[in-house]
UniProtKB/Swiss-Prot annotation:
Residues 1-23 form a transit peptide. This is Large ribosomal subunit protein mL60. Residues 103-115 have a biased composition (Polar residues). The gene is mrpl31. GO terms for molecular function: structural constituent of ribosome.
Length: 115
């Protein structure tokens, strides 16, 4: 359009959601705290069930398949596997965890072997 009524992204697309290209120190800290909180809940549930001589398949499979936050490498904490992001070098097939939808509510601890 010409004149005073030039179109902008905000007018055409509604809200513009800007995602920073890397995680800030505060976001990394909060992400680590969320991972530790999940580990703590799993440990509490597991010990409570063991005291009663019971077990839960879901909790046992979580412990068997997922690393605790203290054992995860920074690459696994802050990036996740994606087929669509194919870059050169170390970041090939990985993208920042904050660029995935609902990254605070979904687990990002499982990656294919070799990636």
């Amino acid at each position: 359009m010409l004149g005073a009524f030039n179109s902008t992204l905000a007018r055409f697309g509604g809200l513009v959601h800007k995602v920073p290209w890397r995680l800030s120190q505060r976001r990394k800290y909060r992400h680590r705290q969320r991972l530790r909180a999940v580990d703590e809940v799993v440990d509490v549930l597991r010990t409570a069930l063991q005291e009663k001589n019971q077990s839960c398949k879901r909790i046992e499979s979580f412990v068997a398949n997922h690393q605790p936050e203290s054992q995860m490498s920074p690459k696994d904490k802050y990036t996740m596997f994606t087929r669509k992001t194919q870059g050169a070098g170390l970041q090939g097939f990985r993208k920042g965890v904050h660029k995935s939808p609902k990254w605070t509510r979904s687990t990002n601890r499982v990656n294919p072997t070799g990636f």
